[in-house]
């Protein structure tokens, strides 16, 4: 498979790529080959009518679709597509070639119409406001498609009836010639031929318009719903997101919705739907999977009602042909309908269950990918893969059951016309009627005309079932509770903030008890010890609350908010930002607000755009903000200054840079109220002092600033201080007042006083990893885009992918078995109708009527049975292939190096594991099966006609060449359009997913419209390509239908001219078959396009499963490590050199040191010294360039990555929590007892060591019994956002304690906790990790001066390494200078050592 690179469109909303946007994958040569006629296959060159034309240049910009303003003839024949098809045949299509959507189809225009209708329908009390609003919006195009299909369906039925008269004409001529009577005039026969041909032509045009209008409506509905889901996600309340009890209004709406679905709520006040809440994963699934199902169903929706109409008309005509005998066949159809109804209900139920499993898989996949760095640190790849595999196993089994039922319905629906015709003909024969070829084969053609609607009806009903379920889910989401703006605005009040007895609550999942039941059922022996668990389970289920808050803050005041971990500092700011629900009292703000949260949300765009955040660029103000936030030095380092793309989630910049960017965003927003949640925790003291001076007390002077902080040394500069305790305001006052009168404040200050000087003077110039991350970028690149451009194949899906797909299905034997079953089923089917012709002409006089009937019935039954076996075998093999390829792709992705995740948007990966896998599961098998059945039927018909009408072969040759030319002409463009659409769709997913994760920040700043506009532009860009993917199908279909019409005409002429020589029975059989050709050719083209387009999804999954770069093996069988390794934890670095990528400078240079088992090493150093690189090297996130690292004598490069990482533990700076419970986060794979988990929570100070109750804030000196309780089953929401950053860091410490590894790496694990908790954590690390090897990368020198040795890094090398006291004695040493700047004296070091 040759690959080229799609230009990055996620940033520009789909702007054309630059000339230098191709990746180094040989795409230039590939595309040159595609465009070069000499590089094409000989038959492609021979059939190329444009081979002498010049290759057109790539346009500079995209233009509006040629459909806009096209003539009636051009629209009817899709001639407006011809210019693009021509370009696509001459060279691969580029993004600039893809036309934009018609102005009246832009999503903004459609959304406005939709929203007006939705409001109107909702106000009118419609039961299905969403459904009716969609109908109102797209009524004209929707009904036009339905009208076209009604005409088409009627013509499909009337054309076979007209063959009765042509067959009668042939019979008359045949009998007349045999009896010597005058033959009928040939003009009469030719008149029938012309009539049938005209009817076929009109039917073709109508069918293509129906399909085009249906797909167009589906694409437009998809666009509107994506925007609606996004808009709702921006407004969704925390309670609805978490799955909690909704407001009475929302409950009433949900009750109405459930009643319409014949489902009642379990009890009043119960959570919505399946009690899961609308987490990010479910919202993404709505946008990617459910919306796509609605889009798919729109394409052929009208078949659901036109099929019954055509069936009824056909039965009336059958009564005319066969009299009452047709009622026998009709009765069989009637009997079959209840079976179909029951089966559809079963499909509806199964699809709902499958949706839940798919949601689980997609949500877990997204969560794993978001925390992949942490998963790698702990070596959990295999365990998470097993968890995904288990969910996938149940999902595939459910899908296979669903498809088996669909196959049964399909085969029954295919068999019904056969058995109905069989029953009618047998009844007709047994009722003493002569089997005249004219009514018999006209009736056979009528029964055959029923085959397509009956075949498609169950598929369409299945799609409608899926869409109905999806529509209900979206409807349920749209009526979910919205975040109310509880905070009032009063521009005239003197204060900036006025809180009067206000109470707030976080809203989390109400169904935690249900989850707890499931977990306990899975682990019946895992129970909490009675002596440890809290007695009040209701309290443990309570979310954290702020109570009785009364506070007024002036417009120009700087107010600090302090308190212990979990006291409610961050919650107070979140409440003012609108993230918490007001439950009592009132809050009023006088002005606009900006929010700098503790956890920075970074967009996948440039640094400047992240700071501007939708505001207009003001160069002077921007420069002032950059300077005040100490970002100028960083801009000089970045390869393209502030235009540098900083990657998804800000992966290319350090924690300190993220925090400063966060502060800069809040300041640049120029609001009068600025909420700052611990903004100085991730920056060093030097930078923190600069920000305090220049930003908080500089640019923001004169504005209302509320600063939550652990840096208590800044309190003296604040106008007032708010002391939080247990979710309440404990005290408010000036620094002097609180120092004099408040005991809790005094206690906090006394704890902090030991560290305050260090915090003021500590002088690492910026956070340690900043320069190291910059070193990962090519310094000489002038404007490199960080995100890798998505691979895009420029050739058809190659045999490599097909072979991989067949192999993944089980074995290559499957392909042979499927082909054999298909051929056998078609042979039996053709023989069934051929036998009917022998019966009508009494070809075998020796056979009785009963024998004819018996053989005829046996062939019909055999045809249905073999078709069912074929269909079931194929769908089972296909879903097995999907399961295996997903497993390979997911395994490969989790085994990919971190550089892959750093340069690939999460939405792009999620797209492959949601949309593409959904296509492989549900659409690919159907498309391949229907294509295979239809193409073999066409071949069978051609062979049959040639056997009896030899001259047909002469006409077939030029028509076949025309068919082949048109197909080749089409496929070149179709491939490129689909691939462009796939990549543009990935960009929409990425943009949608990114914005959903940043909802809190987007809301706080009030920039929802900006992100909506960005998504809108991406959707329009995607639709520009998507609409063309089916427009070119229709262009081809019209032209191939012209071939089919000519085939009908030629066959009709041959029947007329051979009327004296060929039996009327054979003529009737041939005519009945040839009329099905037009439908079949249309269907073949459509299914071939579906197969190719759906195989594109397989190709993308296959690429992830085979082409991604891999890390070293997880296990090396030839070099296993014993269970007890490492027994001592001795680490040796021997001349270690490391660079992040080839061609980049070394970040570790000839580093050598020996760390004894049980030794505690503190690692410090200036910017870019290489401290974090040591961690990367030890975990082998980046492989060494030279040298080696040994642990207890074992070279870590010679053992498996899992064997290494599973024996290490890390406490990272950015802790990651997964959705579930505290138990599942501490011990996700049930490897430890509950007692061990409780002990870890106690040691990490997440629960009180002295009482039975478990409190979040054990460091709270007053230990209030009303504090939020934790149990092992306490729910952890998505990304753990219901816990403060400090609490998450404590959870990471508890996780490391549970792991009980011999070697622990600590990466500034206490940066977001207060000093009292920090002190207790240091004690825990000293006691809990006693005898363990501990490497600690530290910001606060005070925390490591009691370690055994200090390693001072400088420019990738060890500058100093010795005991703290010995390093202090070196007067010109780096460590000595750092200590002096931090206010650490010799006595401090000696004192700490003596304490030890």
Curated annotation (Swiss-Prot):
Stretches the record annotates as Disordered? 1-40, 510-543, 751-787
Which Gene3D superfamilies does the entry mention? ABC transporter type 1, transmembrane domain, P-loop containing nucleotide triphosphate hydrolases
The places in or outside the cell where this protein is found are:
Cell membrane
Bias-annotated ranges (Acidic residues): 757-771
Uses: Cichorine and its derivatives are promising in the course of developing novel herbicides.
Which CDD domains does the annotation name? Answer: ABC_6TM_YOR1_D1_like, ABC_6TM_YOR1_D2_like, ABCC_MRP_domain1, ABCC_MRP_domain2
For bias type Basic and acidic residues, the affected ranges are 510-533
Any one GO cellular component localisation term in the record = plasma membrane
Q: In Gene Ontology terms, what is a biological process of this protein?
A: cichorine biosynthetic process
Q: What does this protein do?
A: ABC-type transporter; part of the gene cluster that mediates the biosynthesis of cichorine, a phytotoxin active against knapweed, corn, and soybeans. CicA is probably involved in the secretion of cichorine.
Q: What is this protein called?
A: ABC-type transporter cicA
Q: Which organism is it from?
A: Emericella nidulans (strain FGSC A4 / ATCC 38163 / CBS 112.46 / NRRL 194 / M139)
Gene name, please?
cicA
């Amino acid at each position: 498979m040759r690959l080229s690179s799609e230009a990055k469109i996620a940033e520009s909303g789909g702007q054309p790529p630059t000339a230098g946007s191709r990746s180094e994958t040989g795409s230039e040569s590939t595309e040159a080959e595609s465009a070069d006629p000499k590089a094409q296959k000989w038959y492609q060159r021979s059939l190329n009518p444009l081979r002498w034309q010049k290759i057109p240049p790539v346009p500079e910009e995209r233009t509006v679709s040629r459909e806009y303003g096209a003539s009636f003839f051009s629209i009817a024949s899709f001639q407006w597509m011809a210019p693009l098809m021509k370009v696509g045949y001459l060279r691969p299509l580029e993004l600039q070639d893809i036309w934009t959507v018609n102005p009246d189809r832009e999503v903004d225009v459609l959304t406005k119409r939709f929203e007006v209708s939705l409001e109107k329908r909702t106000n009118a009390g419609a039961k299905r406001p969403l459904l009716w609003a969609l109908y109102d919006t797209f009524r004209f195009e929707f009904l036009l498609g339905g009208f076209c299909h009604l005409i088409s369906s009627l013509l499909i039925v009337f054309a076979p009836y007209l063959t009765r008269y042509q067959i009668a004409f042939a019979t008359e001529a045949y009998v007349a010639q045999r009896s010597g009577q005058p033959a009928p005039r040939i003009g009469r026969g030719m008149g029938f031929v012309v009539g049938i041909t005209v009817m076929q032509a009109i039917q073709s045009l109508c069918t293509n318009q129906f399909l085009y209008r249906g797909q167009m409506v589906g694409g437009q509905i998809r666009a509107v719903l994506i925007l609606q889901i996004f808009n709702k996600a921006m407004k969704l309340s925390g309670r609805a997101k978490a799955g909690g009890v909704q407001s009475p209004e929302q409950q009433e709406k949900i009750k109405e919705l459930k009643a319409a679905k014949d489902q009642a709520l379990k009890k009043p006040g119960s959570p919505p739907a399946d009690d899961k809440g609308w987490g990010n994963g479910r919202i993404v699934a709505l946008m990617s999977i459910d919306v796509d199902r609605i889009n798919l169903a729109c394409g052929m929706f009208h078949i659901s009602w036109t099929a019954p109409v055509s069936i009824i008309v056909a039965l009336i005509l059958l009564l005319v042909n066969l009299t009452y005998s047709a009622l026998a066949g009709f009765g069989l159809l009637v009997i079959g309908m209840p079976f179909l109804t029951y089966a559809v209900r079963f499909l509806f139920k199964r699809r709902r269950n499958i949706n839940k499993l798919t949601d689980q898989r997609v949500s877990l996949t997204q969560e794993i990918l978001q925390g992949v760095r942490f998963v790698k640190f702990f070596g959990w790849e295999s365990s998470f893969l097993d968890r995904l595999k288990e969910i996938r196993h149940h999902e595939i089994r459910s899908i296979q059951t669903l498809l088996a039922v669909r196959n049964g319905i399909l085969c029954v629906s295919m068999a019904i016309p056969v058995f109905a015709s069989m029953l009618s003909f047998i009844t007709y024969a047994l009722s003493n009627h002569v089997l005249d070829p004219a009514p018999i084969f006209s009736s056979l053609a009528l029964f055959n005309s029923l085959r397509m609607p009956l075949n498609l009806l169950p598929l369409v009903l299945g799609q409608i079932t899926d869409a109905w379920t999806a529509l209900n889910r979206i409807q349920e989401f749209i009526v979910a509770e919205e975040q109310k703006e509880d905070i009032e605005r009063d521009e005239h009040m003197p204060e900036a903030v006025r809180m009067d007895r206000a109470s707030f609550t976080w809203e989390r999942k109400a169904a935690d008890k249900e989850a707890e039941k499931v977990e306990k059922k899975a682990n019946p022996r895992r129970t909490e010890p009675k002596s440890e668990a809290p007695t009040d389970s209701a309290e443990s289920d309570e979310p954290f609350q702020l109570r009785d808050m009364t506070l007024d803050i002036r417009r120009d005041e700087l107010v600090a908010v302090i308190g212990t971990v979990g006291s409610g500092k961050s919650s107070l700011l979140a409440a003012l930002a609108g993230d918490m629900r007001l439950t009592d009292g009132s809050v009023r703000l006088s002005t606009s607000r900006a929010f700098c949260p503790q956890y920075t949300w970074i967009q996948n765009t440039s640094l400047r755009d992240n700071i501007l955040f939708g505001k207009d660029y003001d160069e002077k103000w921007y420069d002032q903000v950059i300077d005040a936030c100490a970002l100028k030095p960083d801009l000089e380092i970045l390869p393209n200054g502030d235009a540098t793309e900083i990657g998804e989630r800000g992966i290319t910049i350090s924690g300190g840079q993220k925090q400063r960017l966060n502060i800069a965003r809040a300041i640049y927003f120029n609001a009068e109220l600025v909420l700052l949640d611990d903004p100085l925790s991730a920056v060093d003291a030097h930078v923190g002092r600069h920000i305090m001076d220049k930003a908080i007390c500089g640019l923001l002077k004169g504005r209302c600033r509320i600063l939550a902080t652990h840096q208590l040394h800044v309190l003296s500069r604040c106008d007032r201080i708010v002391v939080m305790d247990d979710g309440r305001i404990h005290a408010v006052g000036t620094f002097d007042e609180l120092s004099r009168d408040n005991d809790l404040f005094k206690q906090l200050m006394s704890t902090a006083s030991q560290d305050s000087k260090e915090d003021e003077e500590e002088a690492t110039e910026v956070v340690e990893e900043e320069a190291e991350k910059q070193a990962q970028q090519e310094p000489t690149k002038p404007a490199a885009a960080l995100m890798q451009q998505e691979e895009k194949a420029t050739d058809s899906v190659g045999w490599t992918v097909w072979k991989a797909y067949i192999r993944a299905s089980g074995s290559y034997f499957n392909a042979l078995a499927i082909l054999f079953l298909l051929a056998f089923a078609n042979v039996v089917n053709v023989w069934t109708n051929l036998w009917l012709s022998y019966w009508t002409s009494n070809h075998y006089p020796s056979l009785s009527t009963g024998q004819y009937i018996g053989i005829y019935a046996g062939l019909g039954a055999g045809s249905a049975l073999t078709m069912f076996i074929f269909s079931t075998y194929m769908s089972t093999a296909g879903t097995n292939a999907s399961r295996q390829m997903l497993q390979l792709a997911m395994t490969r992705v989790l085994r990919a190096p971190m550089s892959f995740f750093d340069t690939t948007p999460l939405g792009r990966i999620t797209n492959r594991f949601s949309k593409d896998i959904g296509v492989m599961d549900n659409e690919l098998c159907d498309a391949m099966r229907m294509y295979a059945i239809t193409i073999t039927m066409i071949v069978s018909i051609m062979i049959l006609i040639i056997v009896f009408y030899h001259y047909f072969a002469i006409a077939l040759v030029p028509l076949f060449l025309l068919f082949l030319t048109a197909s080749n002409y089409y496929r070149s463009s179709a491939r490129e359009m689909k691939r462009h659409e796939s990549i543009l769709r990935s960009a929409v997913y990425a943009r949608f997913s990114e914005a959903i994760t940043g909802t809190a920040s987007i809301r706080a700043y009030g920039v929802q419209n900006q992100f909506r506009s960005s998504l809108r532009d991406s959707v329009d860009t995607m639709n520009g390509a998507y609409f063309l993917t089916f427009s070119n199908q229709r262009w081809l279909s019209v032209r191939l239908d012209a071939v089919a019409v000519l085939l009908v005409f030629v066959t009709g002429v041959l029947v007329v001219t051979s009327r004296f020589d060929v039996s009327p029975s054979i003529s009737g059989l041939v005519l009945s078959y040839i009329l099905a050709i037009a439908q079949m050719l249309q269907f073949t083209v459509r299914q071939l396009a579906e197969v190719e387009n759906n195989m594109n999804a397989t190709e993308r999954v296959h690429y992830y499963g085979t082409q991604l770069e891999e890390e070293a093996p997880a296990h090396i069988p030839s070099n296993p490590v014993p269970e007890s390794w490492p027994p001592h934890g001795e680490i040796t670095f021997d001349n270690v050199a490391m660079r992040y990528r080839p061609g980049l400078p070394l970040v570790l240079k000839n580093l050598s040191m020996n760390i004894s088992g049980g030794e505690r090493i503190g690692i410090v150093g200036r910017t870019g010294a290489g401290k974090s690189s040591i961690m990367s090297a030890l975990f082998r996130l980046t492989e060494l360039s030279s040298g080696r690292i040994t642990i207890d004598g074992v070279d870590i490069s010679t053992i498996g990555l899992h064997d290494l990482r599973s024996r290490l533990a890390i406490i990272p700076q950015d802790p990651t929590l997964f959705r579930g419970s505290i138990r599942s986060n501490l011990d996700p794979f049930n490897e430890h007892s509950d007692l061990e988990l409780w002990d870890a929570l106690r040691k990490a100070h997440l629960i009180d060591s002295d009482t039975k109750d478990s409190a979040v804030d054990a460091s709270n000196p007053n230990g209030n019994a009303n504090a939020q309780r934790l149990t092992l089953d306490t729910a952890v929401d998505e990304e753990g956002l219901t816990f403060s950053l400090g609490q998450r860091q404590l959870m990471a410490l508890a996780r490391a304690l549970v792991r009980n590894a011999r070697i622990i790496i600590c990466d500034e694990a206490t940066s977001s906790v207060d000093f009292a908790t920090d002190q207790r954590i240091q004690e825990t690390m000293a006691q809990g990790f006693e005898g363990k090897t501990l490497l600690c990368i530290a910001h606060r020198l005070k925390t490591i001066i009691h370690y055994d040795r200090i390693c001072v890094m400088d420019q990738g090398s060890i500058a100093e390494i010795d005991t703290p006291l010995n390093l202090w004695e070196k007067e010109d040493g780096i460590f000595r200078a750092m200590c002096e700047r931090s206010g650490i004296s010799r006595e401090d070091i000696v004192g700490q050592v003596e304490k030890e």
